[in-house]
Amino acid sequence: LHSKHGSVPRAVPGITVGHEMVGIVAEVGSAVSNVKPGDRVTVNVETFCGECFFCKKGFVNNCTDQNGGWALGCRIDGGQAEYVRVPFADQGLNKIPDGVTDRQALLVGDVLATGFWAARISEITPEDTVLILGAGPTGICTLLCVMLHSPKRIIVCEKDASRLQFIRRHYPQVLTVQPEDCAAFVRAHSDHGGADVVLEVAGADSTFRLAWECARPNAVVTVVALYD
């Protein structure tokens, strides 16, 4: 949808979309050694060469190869088709263990990996109050990955009542709040005048502003969402 709305400048009109997928390897090129035909695999949303300056720094989304970064479903044909060619397959494909279903593995290629990376770079400590703005699929995956860091307190802000109910039912230890009450709620439930870490996963102008309103001085604010 971001591509359709014109919010992805590098998107190529007319390509086959689809960047979240699992599949079975049909063929491999001569340089591929990590997977073989018949392997069940996830496909990373980011393809990357592993050799350029940004790849070596870990910023694979900025891979300088023409088929690197967000290429699948954006600049080259993606996964909403019977077959898809995945560049840099040794880095871009991951074997799925036998005990993991396709449905479960599908999350690994994008939304869960996005949440994992966002939580990792947010420098979360056990003393922190962490605010997550947005409880859609990526927001919930971000919540799961934030929980791995065991912060003192997690607050989820979401306007949709059904999503808030989902959080309360499955994660009763997590505090929840609606956007109109968020800033005051965070101040009342934090130790230093605001959240120590804010992860913005909603992608709206209003939530981008709210992230900074809820952050304490010298907080970490991680922008996870894309914006139209």
Residue ranges of predicted features:
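Buried hydrophobic positions in well-ordered alpha/beta secondary-structure cores of metabolic enzymes
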Residues: 23-25, 38, 52, 84, ...
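Glycine-rich cofactor phosphate-binding loops and adjacent beta1-alpha1 units
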Residues: 122, 126, 147, 164-228
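Short, intrinsically disordered, charge-balanced linker/junction segments flanking boundaries
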Residues: 1-3, 34, 223-228
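Mid-domain Rossmann-like dinucleotide-binding core that forms the NAD(H)/NADP(H) cofactor-binding site
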Residues: 95-184
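Structural detector of well-ordered beta-strand residues that form the stable sheet scaffold
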Residues: 22, 42, 131, 155, ...
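Glycine-rich beta-strand-centered segment in the early N-terminal region that forms part
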Residues: 5-56, 97-99
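NAD(P)H dinucleotide-binding glycine-rich loop of Rossmann-like/cofactor-binding domains
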Residues: 51-133
